[in-house]
Amino acid sequence: MRHLIAVLTLVVLNGLLSMPALAGDNSQYDPALAERAGADEYGMKQYVLAFLKKGPNRDRSKEEAEKLQRDHLDNIGRMAKAGKLVLAGPFLNDGELRGIYIFNVRTVEEAKALTETDPAVQAGSLVMELLPWYGSAALVEVNELHKKMAKKAI
């Protein structure tokens, strides 16, 4: 059920982000920005969505868990810097679903290769469910905007 709620939330947010593009011609259209983002004529593009779930191997000491989390966050930063990850974050509960990634890649295979670089996946602490997803191309701008809003680095 939580999985369904998360997906429905993303669908609603994506719809709200893309509504101006669906209303007809857009006087604010910036062709250079659209091309840079890889947008189609509706300002949308294909991504791969990853649901991070609890893996089978989560029994660690506090120190090991903290190091694994640090390595996991470093990997997120590396993928974001490379332009392959446009959004990442945890769910704010202690359920089976731990977080979400939105990969800026066209295929599930590309996303799978990226998830395999995650130390938490390698250690069996997390497993990923990957789904092709169509959303606003504006998401590729999130990481640059985030840098301007974050007082402290993660």
Q: Positions of the model-derived regions?
A:
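Conserved, structured core segments of small domains
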Residues: L22-I154
